[in-house]
Structures are given as structure tokens and as C-alpha cells.
Design a protein with these regions (language model features):
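Structured, active/binding-site neighborhoods that engage oxygen-rich ligands
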Residues: 2-412
Length: 412
């Protein structure tokens, strides 16, 4: 995949789009630095030099994780952010391999390099990188959804390595840019940022690229479902015209917000979706009800069925890419969390299905992490991720759920 060029228009706007309008008083938010040149190519967090991690950041992380109460808002928020990354990192090992049911091979982060990008255990792909861009955009803009800022961060990821897993592995560059998002970014560059909402594709362009990155939205707006769903929709529309894509983001936000608020995954959320969730896309309403669309077996979204499988027709057409359609990804993610009883079992089940396993794994991780929480994620998995993120993903989860403790909500 080629890297983008002719980004001078982006450089001229960086000062505006990457600088918060005000100062957040809380000490934890002061670990953000938008003035460092290093920030632009690596991380939102302050680093004095390459390979150096802020002592303040490490101290804050130690305090917040040691004082976390299981099933608390913070525990669930951090769990969802890390879940996104863990599902992505583990799922990459089998990404684009032909789908397989009921065969468990991978039960941990793996050993040695693996997957199509030959990643080390714990390194993530576009799913997490773009999810971190979304988180950073909300944090730096203090809860205001700024579509151009988000698109700029996506470009910085692909061109400069911002938010990728390789800040301590110079042999790698950003990886995983999908065809639909690539088209949207090229369009944005060609138009010099005039329209942040893509016209690439059409209203049926509904890949899984916006649900895979959605974790930050329900964490940030768990207190206000309507605002959360609104931001979920618009963050999808920057790269996907598809109605099903944005509606699946709304559904995912609805589910994760309820879980962060302490509702039970099975009794309060999944078994009540048919009565409590509705949107303006009929097919997604059918999916939420765990039903089939008429007599079309290839539009069967009955994820509550113990024997639920992907559409046989779509599997036969391209088995390795099954799950790349947002409806397939969402339905299978719900099936996996509905038929397992722990975060670990949910992740193991989804990544071993193969297909688009990193993106479907990312969605499973967001849901399972929000329900079971950070404290119920295997510590050995967390430590593998920490080798590459140095605890910054968890920090984002904590910061996002407390963002409006300090900042007045400003969302279009």
C-alpha cells in the first residue's frame, strides 16, 4: 500500500486541530503534550526522547490500576480499550485464513512473529491504531467531535507511524490499511481536507472499519447515550458512507455504554436489545433482535443460536475475508460474547474462527472488556501488550471515562 503524499494542507492545520482550546486541571490530563514534535509521530503522551516514558504517566497508571475496583466504571472502561487491542493483536495471527468452526489452536498471544504482517506478540494493526486516533481526538478536543482532526490523525498514523505498535520496533511501519478507508483518505487528501465526511463508495459501503475502532465513543459518552450514538454515527461517516456501518457503530455504542454503566451483559443488555434498541436502518434493527431478514438465509442474524455461523454464500465467495462486512462482524461478535462466560474464552473463540479475525476480535474485545473489566483480563496478555504501548491504552480508557468530570460537554 502506498503512503500518502502532498500533505502540506494538513501541516498548516496541525496547530489548530491538534491543540486543545483550554487546560484540563486534573493531573492525569497534564500528561498530554500537544506541543512536542515527538507527539506527532508517536503518541499523545509526553516523551522527552525516543524510548523514554514519562515518570508521571507510570506513577498515575500504577495508582489507578492498584486502586481499581472490579466492575467499576474505570475498570470497565479500561477493559474495553484494552479489549479492542487484545482482540486485534491476537486475531491478527489468523487474519484472512479460511474460516474454521470449533477448532481451538491459539490460546494465548502466540510465540514469535506471525500473521500476514509478521508481527511480534502483542503488536496491533489498523483496528487499534485507528481506535487510538479516535480516542486521542476526543481527549485533545475535550469531548468535541472534530472530524478533520480525526482524519488528520488517521493520515498521521499511516504516513508517520502515529499510534502504531512499532515505536520501539523501527523495523516496522504502520500496517493494515483497508481498501475502503484507503479510498476515503485519498479522497480527503485530493480535496485538501475540504470535506471530512467521505463520498467514497456509496450508502452500501459498510465494511467493519468503523466498528473495529469505536471503543473510545461509549467510554467517553457513557453518561449520555444519545450523544454517544451521535458521535458513533459521525465517526463512521468520515470513512464509510454505508448506513449499516454507522448503525452498527450506534448499536455497539448502545451495548458498551450500558455495560460500562453496570448493566448485566445477558439479562439487562443482550436479552433486551429487541425491545430497547432501535435505529433508522431496518437490517441493523433485525440484527439487534437476533433474527433473520425474511426467508433470506444469507441475511440470518440469529446470533443467539448456539449453532450460528457466517453466511455460507459469503464464506464460499471469500472465506478468508468473512467478517469484513460490518453486519457479519457485529453478529458474530454478539454470538461469541453471548455463548462464552469470560473475557478469555470470548477472545479465544473469536480469533480461532479466522476470517477477518483481528477486526471481529476487536469488536468482541470492546464488548467483553466492558462487561468483564480490566481486572478479569489475563495479566499475562496485558503484559504482552504493555511491551509495545507502555500502558498508554489503559490510560486512555481511564481518561476518557473521566473527561466530562473536568470539561463541559461540547458535541455537535
Amino acid at each position: 500500500m502506498k503512503y500518502f503524499s502532498s500533505l502540506s494542507f494538513l501541516e498548516s492545520n496541525l496547530k489548530y486541530t491538534l491543540t486543545p482550546e483550554g487546560t484540563i486541571d486534573s493531573k492525569i490530563f497534564k500528561t498530554i503534550s500537544s506541543s512536542s514534535n515527538y507527539f506527532r509521530t508517536v503518541s499523545i503522551f509526553d516523551n522527552e526522547s525516543k524510548g523514554t516514558i514519562s515518570r508521571d504517566k507510570k506513577a498515575i497508571f500504577s495508582i489507578l490500576t492498584n486502586s481499581l475496583t472490579p466492575t467499576s466504571i474505570e475498570d470497565k472502561s479500561i477493559g474495553s480499550m484494552l479489549g479492542m487491542c487484545i482482540g486485534d493483536a491476537m486475531g491478527h495471527r489468523f487474519e484472512f485464513e479460511p474460516v474454521v468452526y470449533d477448532k481451538i489452536v491459539l490460546t494465548d498471544m502466540g510465540k514469535g512473529k506471525g500473521g500476514q504482517f509478521e508481527l511480534e506478540p502483542g503488536q496491533w494493526t489498523d483496528d487499534t491504531s485507528m481506535g487510538l486516533c479516535l480516542a486521542d481526538s476526543l481527549l485533545v478536543n475535550e469531548g468535541y467531535f472534530h472530524p478533520r482532526d480525526l482524519m488528520h490523525r488517521f493520515l498521521l498514523w499511516w504516513n508517520n507511524g502515529y499510534n502504531n505498535a512499532f515505536r520501539f520496533d523501527e523495523n516496522k511501519r504502520s500496517c493494515g490499511l483497508g481498501g475502503n478507508i484507503s479510498g476515503s483518505l485519498y479522497e480527503y487528501v485530493e480535496l485538501k481536507g475540504q470535506n471530512p465526511y467521505t463520498k467514497y463508495g456509496d450508502e452500501n459501503t459498510s465494511g467493519n472499519g468503523s466498528i473495529m475502532r469505536n471503543a473510545a465513543v461509549p467510554i467517553c459518552f457513557y453518561k449520555d447515550m444519545n450523544k454517544g450514538r451521535n458521535v458513533a454515527k459521525w465517526q463512521s461517516l468520515v470513512t464509510h458512507q454505508g448506513k449499516e456501518a454507522y448503525a452498527c457503530c450506534e448499536l455497539l455504542t448502545f451495548i458498551v455504554s450500558k455495560l460500562i454503566n453496570g448493566e448485566d451483559l445477558f439479562n439487562d443488555v443482550l436479552n433486551k436489545l429487541d425491545k430497547e434498541f432501535t435505529c433508522d436502518v431496518d437490517s441493523v434493527n433485525t440484527l439487534a433482535k437476533s433474527e433473520q431478514e425474511g426467508d433470506n438465509v444469507n441475511r440470518n442474524w440469529n446470533w443467539k443460536d448456539d449453532n450460528f455461523k457466517y453466511s455460507e454464500e459469503r464464506v464460499n465467495n471469500n472465506s478468508g475475508y468473512i467478517g469484513s462486512y460490518c453486519m457479519d462482524a457485529m453478529a458474530m461478535a454478539l454470538h461469541v460474547v453471548y455463548t462464552t462466560k469470560s473475557f478469555k474464552d470470548a477472545i479465544i473463540k473469536v480469533v480461532n474462527l479466522r476470517g477477518d479475525s483481528d477486526s471481529v476480535g476487536s469488536v468482541v474485545g470492546q464488548i467483553a472488556g466492558a462487561y468483564y473489566g480490566f481486572k478479569n483480563i489475563p495479566i499475562e496478555w496485558i503484559k504482552v501488550i504493555e511491551k509495545w504501548d507502555h500502558q498508554e491504552i489503559a490510560l486512555r480508557g481511564y481518561m476518557l471515562c473521566h473527561l466530562f468530570d473536568d470539561v463541559k460537554s461540547r458535541v455537535n
